Amino acid sequence: MDINWHITVDDKACVKAILEKQRNTWLVRDRYERNLAETKTHVTREQFWEQMVCMRLTTRARSGPGGKLDRFQCLSPFPLAYDTVCRQQSREAFIRSTLSTHQVGTDRIKISRELADNFARLEDREWPRALELCNRLTIRLGTRETEAELADYINDTFEGFGPKQSRNLPQALGLTRFEIPIDIRVTKWLNDEFQFPFKVTPAALSDRHYYKLILDAVCKLCAECDTYPCVLDAAIFSAQDKDA
């Protein structure tokens, strides 16, 4: 069964209004410069792992500019860098201690266990496939299908990465245009500002089929407005950060 989303003039006006208002914000500009760039930087183990850590930490945590998580992500050297974690005898304990020191992560015991498991899985057998799927998107602009293949791989392979987080990671790497993380900011905008035809809830979005249904609507909406979901996502994020 197919659902045919009908985009109205008012729908397009709502999207264009937020895009125009937020077009000069740093995050919208960053999406144009990185996610929409025709050539992208080759993804390394170090970059993939760092973003895996940071994106896992965003679950149920405020991640706007100036917060603890934002400051943690900007630290140089990064406290949980790939080479640093490699050297640890007890990676789970080291990750948990580091998260506690910097006061990031809503459930540090669970997050530490999942990240340690993911690190072991990458080291054991997953690095070739993970980097292949990422770097395929750096060679040429990906289709929505190739982006979705990467998101589904992350969702199926790594602990703590559901439909949203599995799209957060590649978007943070600058790889994706279509497959966006539909987080609480996006659902709030869809429900309150855009007036989506039915209420979109975070709980329902944990189901990958429901998630793809909502993302189908967002992709069609953006196509009709001559923009990309990653840009709309950035505009929504920027607008709600200002309102907070």
Where are these regions (language model features)?
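Basic/aromatic-enriched alpha-helical hairpins
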Residues: T59, R71-F78, N118-L131
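Structure-specific DNA junction-binding interface
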Residues: M1-G105
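Alpha-helix C-capping/helix-to-loop hinge sites
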Residues: T59-R60, T101-H102, L122, A172-T176
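C-terminal accessory module of base-excision DNA glycosylases/AP lyases that mediates lesion recognition
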Residues: M1-E46, K110-F119, W127-A244
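Long, charge-rich low-complexity segments
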Residues: R96-D124
